[in-house]
Protein backbone atom coordinates (compact mmCIF):
# COMPACT_ATOMS: atom_id res chain seq x y z
CA UNK A 1 0.00 0.00 0.00
CA UNK A 2 1.20 3.52 -0.78
CA UNK A 3 2.81 4.72 2.47
CA UNK A 4 1.53 8.26 1.90
CA UNK A 5 -2.08 7.02 1.76
CA UNK A 6 -1.54 4.77 4.78
CA UNK A 7 -0.18 7.70 6.81
CA UNK A 8 -3.00 9.94 5.64
CA UNK A 9 -5.65 7.43 6.74
CA UNK A 10 -3.93 6.78 10.06
CA UNK A 11 -3.79 10.52 10.77
CA UNK A 12 -7.49 10.92 9.99
CA UNK A 13 -8.53 7.94 12.12
CA UNK A 14 -6.24 8.91 15.00
CA UNK A 15 -7.61 12.47 15.03
CA UNK A 16 -11.20 11.20 14.97
CA UNK A 17 -10.66 8.72 17.83
CA UNK A 18 -8.96 11.37 19.97
CA UNK A 19 -11.86 13.77 19.44
CA UNK A 20 -14.41 11.08 20.34
CA UNK A 21 -12.43 10.14 23.44
CA UNK A 22 -12.33 13.78 24.54
CA UNK A 23 -16.07 14.09 23.98
CA UNK A 24 -16.75 10.94 26.02
CA UNK A 25 -14.22 11.93 28.75
CA UNK A 26 -12.13 8.82 28.14
CA UNK A 27 -8.37 8.86 28.62
CA UNK A 28 -6.49 7.22 25.76
CA UNK A 29 -3.13 5.57 26.34
CA UNK A 30 -2.40 4.42 22.79
CA UNK A 31 -4.24 4.22 19.49
CA UNK A 32 -3.55 0.98 17.66
CA UNK A 33 -4.95 1.17 14.14
CA UNK A 34 -5.23 -2.26 12.49
CA UNK A 35 -5.17 -2.15 8.68
CA UNK A 36 -5.40 -5.25 6.51
CA UNK A 37 -6.43 -6.48 3.08
CA UNK A 38 -10.10 -7.43 2.72
CA UNK A 39 -10.70 -11.16 2.06
CA UNK A 40 -12.13 -10.30 -1.38
CA UNK A 41 -10.85 -7.56 -3.71
CA UNK A 42 -14.39 -6.41 -4.56
CA UNK A 43 -14.87 -5.36 -0.92
CA UNK A 44 -12.16 -2.72 -1.27
CA UNK A 45 -8.41 -2.18 -1.20
CA UNK A 46 -8.03 -1.75 2.55
CA UNK A 47 -9.97 -2.81 5.62
CA UNK A 48 -9.80 -1.05 9.01
CA UNK A 49 -10.94 -2.81 12.17
CA UNK A 50 -13.24 -0.43 14.10
CA UNK A 51 -14.47 -2.86 16.76
CA UNK A 52 -11.37 -2.32 18.95
CA UNK A 53 -12.18 1.40 19.19
CA UNK A 54 -15.76 0.53 20.10
CA UNK A 55 -14.53 -1.35 23.20
CA UNK A 56 -12.26 1.52 24.28
CA UNK A 57 -14.73 4.35 23.67
CA UNK A 58 -17.79 2.35 24.80
CA UNK A 59 -19.62 3.52 21.68
CA UNK A 60 -21.48 1.59 19.01
CA UNK A 61 -19.25 0.68 16.06
CA UNK A 62 -21.59 2.43 13.62
CA UNK A 63 -21.20 5.76 15.46
CA UNK A 64 -17.40 5.60 15.27
CA UNK A 65 -17.49 4.52 11.62
CA UNK A 66 -19.79 7.42 10.69
CA UNK A 67 -17.44 9.92 12.33
CA UNK A 68 -14.41 8.51 10.50
CA UNK A 69 -16.28 8.54 7.16
CA UNK A 70 -17.17 12.22 7.74
CA UNK A 71 -13.52 13.06 8.32
CA UNK A 72 -12.38 11.10 5.24
CA UNK A 73 -14.89 12.95 3.08
CA UNK A 74 -14.53 12.31 -0.65
CA UNK A 75 -10.78 11.54 -0.53
CA UNK A 76 -11.51 7.80 -0.63
CA UNK A 77 -14.57 5.65 -1.28
CA UNK A 78 -15.75 4.11 1.99
CA UNK A 79 -18.19 1.40 3.03
CA UNK A 80 -19.00 0.12 6.52
CA UNK A 81 -19.34 -3.64 6.91
CA UNK A 82 -19.99 -4.78 10.49
CA UNK A 83 -16.88 -4.18 12.60
CA UNK A 84 -14.86 -3.08 9.54
CA UNK A 85 -14.57 0.06 7.46
CA UNK A 86 -13.55 -0.79 3.90
CA UNK A 87 -11.67 1.73 1.79
CA UNK A 88 -11.43 1.91 -1.99
CA UNK A 89 -8.66 3.96 -3.55
CA UNK A 90 -8.94 6.21 -6.58
CA UNK A 91 -7.34 3.72 -8.95
CA UNK A 92 -6.31 6.21 -11.63
CA UNK A 93 -4.49 8.46 -9.15
CA UNK A 94 -3.00 5.50 -7.28
CA UNK A 95 -1.61 3.93 -10.46
CA UNK A 96 -0.14 7.20 -11.73
CA UNK A 97 1.42 8.12 -8.36
CA UNK A 98 2.92 4.66 -7.84
CA UNK A 99 4.51 4.35 -11.30
CA UNK A 100 5.89 7.89 -11.18
CA UNK A 101 7.33 7.37 -7.70
CA UNK A 102 9.17 4.18 -8.68
CA UNK A 103 10.52 5.49 -11.98
CA UNK A 104 11.67 8.77 -10.43
CA UNK A 105 13.28 7.28 -7.31
CA UNK A 106 14.78 4.30 -9.17
CA UNK A 107 17.25 2.40 -6.90
CA UNK A 108 16.14 4.54 -3.95
CA UNK A 109 12.56 3.30 -4.21
CA UNK A 110 11.57 1.51 -1.01
CA UNK A 111 14.17 3.25 1.17
CA UNK A 112 12.70 4.50 4.46
CA UNK A 113 13.78 5.97 7.78
CA UNK A 114 12.23 3.68 10.41
CA UNK A 115 15.71 2.89 11.76
CA UNK A 116 17.21 6.33 11.11
CA UNK A 117 20.41 7.02 13.10
CA UNK A 118 20.31 3.58 14.74
CA UNK A 119 23.82 2.12 14.89
CA UNK A 120 23.72 -1.64 14.27
CA UNK A 121 26.60 -4.11 14.15
CA UNK A 122 26.08 -7.44 12.40
CA UNK A 123 28.61 -10.19 13.05
CA UNK A 124 28.34 -13.01 10.57
CA UNK A 125 30.30 -15.75 8.80
CA UNK A 126 32.99 -16.18 11.54
CA UNK A 127 34.64 -19.20 9.89
CA UNK A 128 37.22 -21.53 11.37
CA UNK A 129 40.53 -21.66 9.51
CA UNK A 130 40.65 -25.45 9.32
CA UNK A 131 38.35 -25.92 6.33
CA UNK A 132 36.76 -24.17 3.35
CA UNK A 133 33.35 -22.54 3.58
CA UNK A 134 30.51 -25.02 3.04
CA UNK A 135 26.83 -24.57 2.25
CA UNK A 136 26.00 -23.93 5.92
CA UNK A 137 28.44 -21.01 5.88
CA UNK A 138 26.78 -19.77 2.69
CA UNK A 139 23.45 -19.56 4.51
CA UNK A 140 25.09 -17.60 7.34
CA UNK A 141 26.85 -15.30 4.86
CA UNK A 142 23.81 -14.52 2.74
CA UNK A 143 21.59 -13.91 5.79
CA UNK A 144 24.16 -11.47 7.18
CA UNK A 145 24.78 -9.72 3.86
CA UNK A 146 21.10 -9.47 2.91
CA UNK A 147 19.97 -8.33 6.36
CA UNK A 148 22.69 -5.66 6.37
CA UNK A 149 21.34 -4.27 3.10
CA UNK A 150 17.75 -4.40 4.33
CA UNK A 151 18.58 -2.58 7.57
CA UNK A 152 20.50 0.07 5.60
CA UNK A 153 17.44 0.50 3.37
CA UNK A 154 15.48 1.29 6.55
CA UNK A 155 17.92 4.03 7.53
CA UNK A 156 20.23 2.20 9.96
CA UNK A 157 23.98 2.78 10.13
CA UNK A 158 25.19 -0.79 9.64
CA UNK A 159 28.68 -2.15 10.30
CA UNK A 160 29.39 -5.67 9.02
CA UNK A 161 31.90 -7.61 11.11
CA UNK A 162 33.62 -10.95 10.64
CA UNK A 163 35.49 -12.64 13.51
CA UNK A 164 37.75 -15.30 12.00
CA UNK A 165 38.45 -18.12 14.44
CA UNK A 166 42.15 -18.66 13.73
CA UNK A 167 43.28 -20.24 17.00
CA UNK A 168 42.43 -23.29 19.11
CA UNK A 169 42.32 -27.04 18.77
CA UNK A 170 40.59 -27.02 15.37
CA UNK A 171 43.54 -25.43 13.56
CA UNK A 172 45.97 -27.52 15.65
CA UNK A 173 44.36 -30.66 14.19
CA UNK A 174 45.14 -29.52 10.66
CA UNK A 175 48.63 -28.47 11.79
CA UNK A 176 49.37 -31.89 13.31
CA UNK A 177 48.17 -33.71 10.18
CA UNK A 178 50.25 -31.41 7.99
CA UNK A 179 53.35 -32.12 10.10
CA UNK A 180 52.77 -35.87 9.78
CA UNK A 181 51.49 -36.19 6.21
CA UNK A 182 52.08 -32.84 4.48
CA UNK A 183 55.48 -33.45 2.88
CA UNK A 184 55.90 -29.65 2.66
CA UNK A 185 53.13 -29.35 0.10
CA UNK A 186 51.61 -25.94 -0.71
CA UNK A 187 48.45 -24.76 -2.47
CA UNK A 188 50.55 -24.16 -5.59
CA UNK A 189 52.11 -27.64 -5.55
CA UNK A 190 48.82 -29.38 -4.77
CA UNK A 191 46.88 -27.24 -7.29
CA UNK A 192 44.30 -26.56 -4.58
CA UNK A 193 42.93 -23.45 -2.93
CA UNK A 194 44.55 -22.98 0.47
CA UNK A 195 41.35 -23.48 2.45
CA UNK A 196 40.63 -26.74 0.62
CA UNK A 197 44.15 -28.00 1.28
CA UNK A 198 43.85 -27.24 5.00
CA UNK A 199 40.43 -28.92 5.04
CA UNK A 200 41.97 -32.08 3.59
CA UNK A 201 44.42 -32.21 6.49
CA UNK A 202 41.59 -31.69 8.99
CA UNK A 203 39.92 -34.81 7.57
CA UNK A 204 43.28 -36.65 7.63
CA UNK A 205 43.69 -35.81 11.33
CA UNK A 206 40.32 -37.36 12.17
CA UNK A 207 41.25 -40.50 10.24
CA UNK A 208 44.54 -40.60 12.15
CA UNK A 209 42.83 -40.02 15.52
CA UNK A 210 40.52 -43.03 15.05
CA UNK A 211 43.48 -45.38 15.34
CA UNK A 212 45.76 -43.38 17.67
CA UNK A 213 44.76 -42.91 21.31
CA UNK A 214 47.49 -40.30 21.84
CA UNK A 215 46.20 -37.99 19.08
CA UNK A 216 44.31 -35.74 21.51
CA UNK A 217 47.39 -35.45 23.74
CA UNK A 218 49.44 -34.45 20.71
CA UNK A 219 46.91 -31.71 19.93
CA UNK A 220 47.09 -30.34 23.48
CA UNK A 221 50.90 -30.33 23.33
CA UNK A 222 50.78 -28.45 20.03
CA UNK A 223 48.31 -25.93 21.47
CA UNK A 224 50.55 -25.38 24.52
CA UNK A 225 53.53 -24.78 22.24
CA UNK A 226 51.53 -22.20 20.31
CA UNK A 227 50.43 -20.44 23.50
CA UNK A 228 54.04 -20.41 24.72
CA UNK A 229 55.15 -18.83 21.45
CA UNK A 230 57.30 -21.72 20.19
CA UNK A 231 58.89 -20.34 17.02
CA UNK A 232 58.44 -23.34 14.70
CA UNK A 233 54.87 -23.94 15.89
CA UNK A 234 53.91 -20.29 15.40
CA UNK A 235 55.50 -20.25 11.93
CA UNK A 236 53.52 -23.33 10.88
CA UNK A 237 50.33 -21.83 12.36
CA UNK A 238 50.84 -18.57 10.47
CA UNK A 239 51.53 -20.38 7.18
CA UNK A 240 48.47 -22.64 7.35
CA UNK A 241 46.21 -19.82 8.54
CA UNK A 242 47.38 -17.58 5.71
CA UNK A 243 46.51 -20.26 3.15
CA UNK A 244 43.10 -20.85 4.71
CA UNK A 245 42.19 -17.16 5.04
CA UNK A 246 43.29 -16.35 1.47
CA UNK A 247 41.07 -19.18 0.23
CA UNK A 248 38.10 -18.08 2.34
CA UNK A 249 38.45 -14.47 1.15
CA UNK A 250 38.45 -15.69 -2.46
CA UNK A 251 35.08 -17.36 -1.79
CA UNK A 252 33.74 -14.12 -0.27
CA UNK A 253 34.78 -12.29 -3.44
CA UNK A 254 33.13 -14.92 -5.62
CA UNK A 255 29.84 -14.70 -3.70
CA UNK A 256 29.92 -10.89 -3.31
CA UNK A 257 30.06 -10.99 0.50
CA UNK A 258 31.81 -7.98 2.05
CA UNK A 259 32.76 -6.79 5.53
CA UNK A 260 33.56 -3.41 7.04
CA UNK A 261 35.91 -4.95 9.58
CA UNK A 262 37.58 -8.34 9.96
CA UNK A 263 38.94 -9.43 13.34
CA UNK A 264 41.27 -12.34 14.02
CA UNK A 265 40.51 -14.15 17.26
CA UNK A 266 44.24 -14.61 17.95
CA UNK A 267 44.63 -10.82 18.18
CA UNK A 268 41.84 -10.11 20.66
CA UNK A 269 41.14 -13.25 22.71
CA UNK A 270 42.92 -11.99 25.86
CA UNK A 271 40.80 -8.85 26.31
CA UNK A 272 37.95 -10.64 28.12
CA UNK A 273 40.24 -11.73 30.98
CA UNK A 274 40.72 -8.14 32.15
CA UNK A 275 36.96 -7.58 32.20
CA UNK A 276 36.38 -10.61 34.43
CA UNK A 277 39.09 -9.53 36.86
CA UNK A 278 37.50 -6.09 37.06
CA UNK A 279 34.11 -7.71 37.69
CA UNK A 280 35.68 -9.72 40.50
CA UNK A 281 37.01 -6.53 42.14
CA UNK A 282 33.53 -4.97 41.95
CA UNK A 283 31.86 -8.04 43.47
CA UNK A 284 29.91 -8.85 40.31
CA UNK A 285 31.39 -12.36 40.18
CA UNK A 286 33.27 -14.49 42.69
CA UNK A 287 36.29 -16.78 43.10
CA UNK A 288 35.66 -20.45 43.78
CA UNK A 289 37.80 -22.46 46.23
CA UNK A 290 39.88 -23.91 43.41
CA UNK A 291 40.64 -20.42 42.09
CA UNK A 292 38.21 -20.37 39.16
CA UNK A 293 36.21 -17.14 38.76
CA UNK A 294 32.47 -17.80 38.42
CA UNK A 295 29.11 -16.13 38.13
CA UNK A 296 25.64 -17.50 38.91
CA UNK A 297 23.21 -17.53 36.01
CA UNK A 298 19.47 -18.29 36.16
CA UNK A 299 18.25 -21.65 34.88
CA UNK A 300 15.01 -22.18 33.01
CA UNK A 301 12.24 -22.14 35.59
CA UNK A 302 8.81 -23.75 35.41
CA UNK A 303 5.51 -22.39 36.71
CA UNK A 304 5.73 -23.92 40.19
CA UNK A 305 9.42 -23.69 41.06
CA UNK A 306 11.30 -20.65 42.29
CA UNK A 307 14.12 -19.25 40.18
CA UNK A 308 17.18 -21.48 40.40
CA UNK A 309 20.77 -20.51 39.58
CA UNK A 310 23.73 -22.48 38.32
CA UNK A 311 27.40 -21.71 38.43
CA UNK A 312 29.16 -20.59 35.26
CA UNK A 313 32.97 -20.49 35.05
CA UNK A 314 34.32 -17.30 33.44
CA UNK A 315 38.03 -17.88 34.05
CA UNK A 316 39.53 -21.30 34.71
CA UNK A 317 41.59 -21.90 37.87
CA UNK A 318 44.78 -21.71 35.78
CA UNK A 319 43.77 -18.26 34.56
CA UNK A 320 42.87 -19.26 30.99
CA UNK A 321 39.65 -17.99 29.44
CA UNK A 322 36.71 -19.77 27.83
CA UNK A 323 34.81 -18.74 24.68
CA UNK A 324 32.26 -16.81 26.74
CA UNK A 325 35.03 -14.70 28.27
CA UNK A 326 36.43 -13.91 24.83
CA UNK A 327 32.96 -12.93 23.58
CA UNK A 328 32.58 -10.52 26.52
CA UNK A 329 35.87 -8.92 25.50
CA UNK A 330 34.62 -8.59 21.93
CA UNK A 331 31.46 -6.80 23.10
CA UNK A 332 33.54 -4.25 25.03
CA UNK A 333 35.89 -3.74 22.06
CA UNK A 334 33.01 -3.08 19.69
CA UNK A 335 31.13 -0.89 22.14
CA UNK A 336 34.23 1.30 22.48
CA UNK A 337 34.93 1.29 18.75
CA UNK A 338 31.43 1.72 17.31
CA UNK A 339 29.18 2.74 20.25
CA UNK A 340 26.45 0.49 18.84
CA UNK A 341 22.76 0.59 19.72
CA UNK A 342 22.37 -3.05 18.77
CA UNK A 343 24.70 -5.92 17.94
CA UNK A 344 23.31 -8.87 15.98
CA UNK A 345 25.06 -12.23 15.93
CA UNK A 346 24.14 -14.41 12.94
CA UNK A 347 24.90 -17.84 14.38
CA UNK A 348 23.25 -21.27 14.06
CA UNK A 349 20.46 -22.38 16.38
CA UNK A 350 22.73 -24.86 18.18
CA UNK A 351 24.31 -21.87 19.96
CA UNK A 352 21.09 -20.51 21.52
CA UNK A 353 22.11 -21.42 25.08
CA UNK A 354 25.57 -19.87 24.69
CA UNK A 355 24.17 -16.52 23.62
CA UNK A 356 21.49 -16.47 26.32
CA UNK A 357 24.28 -16.93 28.86
CA UNK A 358 26.55 -14.38 27.17
CA UNK A 359 23.87 -11.68 27.10
CA UNK A 360 22.92 -12.29 30.73
CA UNK A 361 26.55 -12.05 31.88
CA UNK A 362 27.21 -8.94 29.74
CA UNK A 363 24.26 -7.25 31.42
CA UNK A 364 25.26 -8.47 34.90
CA UNK A 365 28.81 -7.13 34.51
CA UNK A 366 27.49 -3.77 33.28
CA UNK A 367 28.99 -4.11 29.80
CA UNK A 368 25.74 -3.49 27.93
CA UNK A 369 22.02 -4.20 28.35
CA UNK A 370 20.66 -7.56 27.23
CA UNK A 371 18.21 -5.94 24.80
CA UNK A 372 21.15 -4.35 22.91
CA UNK A 373 22.35 -7.83 21.93
CA UNK A 374 20.51 -10.14 19.51
CA UNK A 375 21.21 -13.74 18.57
CA UNK A 376 19.73 -14.19 15.11
CA UNK A 377 19.68 -17.98 15.07
CA UNK A 378 19.13 -19.82 11.82
CA UNK A 379 18.33 -23.42 11.00
CA UNK A 380 20.72 -25.99 9.64
CA UNK A 381 21.26 -26.77 5.96
CA UNK A 382 20.99 -30.52 5.51
CA UNK A 383 21.70 -32.81 2.59
CA UNK A 384 19.36 -35.56 1.35
CA UNK A 385 21.82 -38.09 2.83
CA UNK A 386 21.82 -36.44 6.28
CA UNK A 387 23.67 -33.91 8.43
CA UNK A 388 27.02 -32.57 7.21
CA UNK A 389 30.21 -33.36 9.15
CA UNK A 390 33.38 -31.49 8.16
CA UNK A 391 35.66 -33.91 9.99
CA UNK A 392 34.38 -36.76 7.82
CA UNK A 393 34.45 -34.74 4.61
CA UNK A 394 30.67 -35.12 4.26
CA UNK A 395 29.98 -31.53 3.22
CA UNK A 396 29.06 -29.51 0.15
CA UNK A 397 31.93 -27.04 -0.14
CA UNK A 398 30.78 -23.59 -1.25
CA UNK A 399 33.26 -23.41 -4.13
CA UNK A 400 32.38 -26.89 -5.39
CA UNK A 401 28.65 -26.20 -5.17
CA UNK A 402 28.98 -23.01 -7.21
CA UNK A 403 31.18 -24.83 -9.74
CA UNK A 404 28.76 -27.77 -10.05
CA UNK A 405 25.74 -25.53 -10.57
CA UNK A 406 27.65 -23.39 -13.07
CA UNK A 407 28.67 -26.48 -15.06
CA UNK A 408 25.04 -27.63 -15.23
CA UNK A 409 23.99 -24.20 -16.49
CA UNK A 410 26.82 -24.05 -19.06
CA UNK A 411 25.68 -27.38 -20.53
CA UNK A 412 22.13 -26.04 -20.83
CA UNK A 413 23.32 -22.77 -22.41
CA UNK A 414 25.40 -24.63 -25.00
CA UNK A 415 22.39 -26.78 -25.89
CA UNK A 416 20.19 -23.74 -26.49
CA UNK A 417 22.69 -21.22 -27.86
CA UNK A 418 26.16 -22.42 -28.81
CA UNK A 419 27.17 -18.92 -30.00
CA UNK A 420 27.04 -17.27 -26.57
CA UNK A 421 30.49 -15.97 -25.65
CA UNK A 422 29.86 -14.84 -22.07
CA UNK A 423 28.28 -18.10 -20.92
CA UNK A 424 30.68 -18.56 -17.99
CA UNK A 425 29.73 -15.22 -16.43
CA UNK A 426 26.04 -15.90 -17.07
CA UNK A 427 26.36 -19.36 -15.49
CA UNK A 428 28.11 -17.96 -12.41
CA UNK A 429 25.44 -15.27 -11.94
CA UNK A 430 22.61 -17.78 -12.31
CA UNK A 431 24.25 -20.18 -9.85
CA UNK A 432 24.70 -17.38 -7.29
CA UNK A 433 21.09 -16.33 -7.80
CA UNK A 434 20.00 -19.93 -7.31
CA UNK A 435 21.99 -20.46 -4.11
CA UNK A 436 21.32 -17.12 -2.46
CA UNK A 437 17.59 -17.19 -3.15
CA UNK A 438 17.20 -20.82 -2.06
CA UNK A 439 18.95 -20.07 1.24
CA UNK A 440 16.88 -16.92 1.84
CA UNK A 441 13.35 -17.86 0.77
CA UNK A 442 12.77 -20.02 3.87
CA UNK A 443 12.24 -18.28 7.22
CA UNK A 444 15.67 -18.18 8.84
CA UNK A 445 14.76 -20.19 11.96
CA UNK A 446 13.77 -23.22 9.85
CA UNK A 447 16.09 -26.00 8.68
CA UNK A 448 16.64 -26.42 4.95
CA UNK A 449 17.03 -29.59 2.91
CA UNK A 450 19.10 -28.34 -0.02
CA UNK A 451 17.88 -29.51 -3.43
CA UNK A 452 20.17 -28.58 -6.34
CA UNK A 453 17.58 -29.19 -9.07
CA UNK A 454 14.91 -27.17 -7.28
CA UNK A 455 17.30 -24.27 -6.70
CA UNK A 456 18.04 -24.09 -10.46
CA UNK A 457 14.41 -24.23 -11.60
CA UNK A 458 13.41 -21.55 -14.11
CA UNK A 459 9.70 -22.07 -13.53
CA UNK A 460 9.18 -22.15 -9.75
CA UNK A 461 9.92 -20.16 -6.63
CA UNK A 462 13.63 -19.74 -7.38
CA UNK A 463 16.38 -17.20 -7.97
CA UNK A 464 16.81 -18.08 -11.68
CA UNK A 465 13.07 -17.56 -12.22
CA UNK A 466 13.26 -14.03 -10.79
CA UNK A 467 16.43 -13.34 -12.80
CA UNK A 468 14.64 -14.60 -15.92
CA UNK A 469 11.63 -12.32 -15.38
CA UNK A 470 14.00 -9.36 -14.95
CA UNK A 471 15.80 -10.24 -18.20
CA UNK A 472 12.45 -10.73 -19.97
CA UNK A 473 11.26 -7.24 -18.96
CA UNK A 474 14.57 -5.75 -20.09
CA UNK A 475 14.08 -7.44 -23.47
CA UNK A 476 10.61 -5.89 -23.75
CA UNK A 477 12.03 -2.44 -22.98
CA UNK A 478 14.80 -2.86 -25.58
CA UNK A 479 12.24 -3.87 -28.21
CA UNK A 480 10.14 -0.81 -27.31
CA UNK A 481 13.16 1.51 -27.66
CA UNK A 482 13.86 0.12 -31.15
CA UNK A 483 10.35 1.15 -32.29
CA UNK A 484 11.09 4.80 -31.40
CA UNK A 485 7.42 5.58 -30.73
CA UNK A 486 6.56 9.18 -29.85
CA UNK A 487 5.58 9.48 -26.17
CA UNK A 488 5.17 13.12 -25.28
CA UNK A 489 2.52 12.33 -22.69
CA UNK A 490 1.66 9.09 -20.91
CA UNK A 491 -1.97 8.39 -20.11
CA UNK A 492 -2.01 6.06 -17.09
CA UNK A 493 -5.83 6.13 -17.16
CA UNK A 494 -5.56 3.48 -19.88
CA UNK A 495 -4.23 0.92 -17.37
CA UNK A 496 -7.60 -0.54 -16.45
CA UNK A 497 -7.31 -4.34 -16.41
CA UNK A 498 -7.24 -6.26 -13.13
CA UNK A 499 -3.75 -7.70 -13.69
CA UNK A 500 -2.36 -4.18 -13.96
CA UNK A 501 -4.11 -3.12 -10.78
CA UNK A 502 -2.82 -6.21 -8.96
CA UNK A 503 0.76 -5.45 -10.04
CA UNK A 504 0.46 -1.83 -8.94
CA UNK A 505 -0.75 -2.86 -5.49
CA UNK A 506 2.19 -5.26 -5.12
CA UNK A 507 4.72 -2.63 -6.24
CA UNK A 508 3.27 -0.07 -3.83
CA UNK A 509 3.78 -2.48 -0.91
CA UNK A 510 7.56 -2.74 -1.40
CA UNK A 511 8.47 -0.22 1.29
CA UNK A 512 6.19 -1.97 3.78
CA UNK A 513 7.93 -5.27 3.07
CA UNK A 514 11.35 -3.70 3.64
CA UNK A 515 10.11 -2.31 6.96
CA UNK A 516 8.69 -5.70 7.95
CA UNK A 517 11.90 -7.51 6.95
CA UNK A 518 13.88 -4.96 8.99
CA UNK A 519 11.73 -5.28 12.09
CA UNK A 520 11.52 -9.08 11.89
CA UNK A 521 15.21 -9.39 10.95
CA UNK A 522 14.05 -11.75 8.21
CA UNK A 523 15.22 -11.49 4.56
CA UNK A 524 12.72 -14.19 3.49
CA UNK A 525 10.08 -11.42 3.54
CA UNK A 526 11.84 -9.75 0.59
CA UNK A 527 12.60 -13.06 -1.14
CA UNK A 528 8.96 -14.14 -1.21
CA UNK A 529 7.79 -10.64 -2.12
CA UNK A 530 10.12 -10.64 -5.15
CA UNK A 531 8.69 -13.99 -6.27
CA UNK A 532 5.12 -12.70 -5.90
CA UNK A 533 5.92 -9.65 -8.05
CA UNK A 534 7.78 -11.69 -10.69
CA UNK A 535 4.96 -14.24 -10.88
CA UNK A 536 2.30 -11.51 -11.18
CA UNK A 537 4.17 -9.87 -14.05
CA UNK A 538 4.60 -13.25 -15.81
CA UNK A 539 0.84 -13.78 -15.69
CA UNK A 540 0.31 -10.26 -17.01
CA UNK A 541 2.83 -10.78 -19.83
CA UNK A 542 1.16 -14.02 -20.93
CA UNK A 543 -2.32 -12.48 -20.98
CA UNK A 544 -1.50 -9.00 -22.29
CA UNK A 545 0.01 -7.48 -25.42
CA UNK A 546 2.37 -4.96 -23.85
CA UNK A 547 3.73 -3.49 -27.11
CA UNK A 548 1.03 -2.71 -29.69
CA UNK A 549 2.12 -0.39 -32.52
CA UNK A 550 -1.54 0.29 -33.30
CA UNK A 551 -2.14 1.55 -29.73
CA UNK A 552 0.87 3.77 -28.94
CA UNK A 553 -0.71 5.51 -25.93
CA UNK A 554 -1.58 2.22 -24.26
CA UNK A 555 1.88 0.87 -25.13
CA UNK A 556 3.58 3.86 -23.45
CA UNK A 557 1.56 3.35 -20.28
CA UNK A 558 2.27 -0.38 -20.16
CA UNK A 559 5.97 0.18 -20.80
CA UNK A 560 6.14 2.62 -17.89
CA UNK A 561 4.41 0.03 -15.72
CA UNK A 562 6.95 -2.58 -16.90
CA UNK A 563 9.81 -0.20 -16.03
CA UNK A 564 8.40 0.17 -12.52
CA UNK A 565 8.17 -3.61 -12.13
CA UNK A 566 11.75 -4.09 -13.35
CA UNK A 567 13.08 -1.38 -11.02
CA UNK A 568 11.33 -2.94 -8.04
CA UNK A 569 12.65 -6.41 -8.94
CA UNK A 570 16.18 -4.99 -9.31
CA UNK A 571 15.87 -3.33 -5.90
CA UNK A 572 14.75 -6.66 -4.43
CA UNK A 573 17.66 -8.45 -6.06
CA UNK A 574 20.10 -5.95 -4.57
CA UNK A 575 18.68 -6.57 -1.08
CA UNK A 576 18.99 -10.34 -1.64
CA UNK A 577 22.50 -10.15 -3.18
CA UNK A 578 21.22 -11.76 -6.38
CA UNK A 579 22.94 -10.68 -9.63
CA UNK A 580 20.72 -8.89 -12.14
CA UNK A 581 21.28 -9.78 -15.79
CA UNK A 582 19.99 -7.88 -18.80
CA UNK A 583 20.08 -11.08 -20.84
CA UNK A 584 19.98 -14.79 -19.98
From Swiss-Prot:
It comes from Borrelia hermsii (strain HS1 / DAH). InterPro entries: aa-tRNA-synth_I_CS (IPR001412), Arg-tRNA-ligase (IPR001278), Arg-tRNA-synth_N (IPR005148), Arg-tRNA-synth_N_sf (IPR036695), ArgRS_core (IPR035684), DALR_anticod-bd (IPR008909), Rossmann-like_a/b/a_fold (IPR014729), tRNAsynth_Ia_anticodon-bd (IPR009080). The keyword Cytoplasm applies. SMART domains: Arg_tRNA_synt_N, DALR_1. Belongs to the class-I aminoacyl-tRNA synthetase family. One of its GO terms (cellular component) is cytoplasm. A motif ('HIGH' region) lies at residues 127-137. One of its GO terms (molecular function) is arginine-tRNA ligase activity. One of its GO terms (biological process) is arginyl-tRNA aminoacylation. It catalyses: tRNA(Arg) + L-arginine + ATP = L-arginyl-tRNA(Arg) + AMP + diphosphate. NCBIfam families: argS. Pfam families: Arg_tRNA_synt_N, DALR_1, tRNA-synt_1d. Keywords: Aminoacyl-tRNA synthetase, ATP-binding, Cytoplasm, Ligase, Nucleotide-binding, Protein biosynthesis. Monomer. It comes from the Bacteria. It is found in: Cytoplasm. Its EC number is 6.1.1.19. Its main location: cytoplasm. This is Arginine--tRNA ligase.
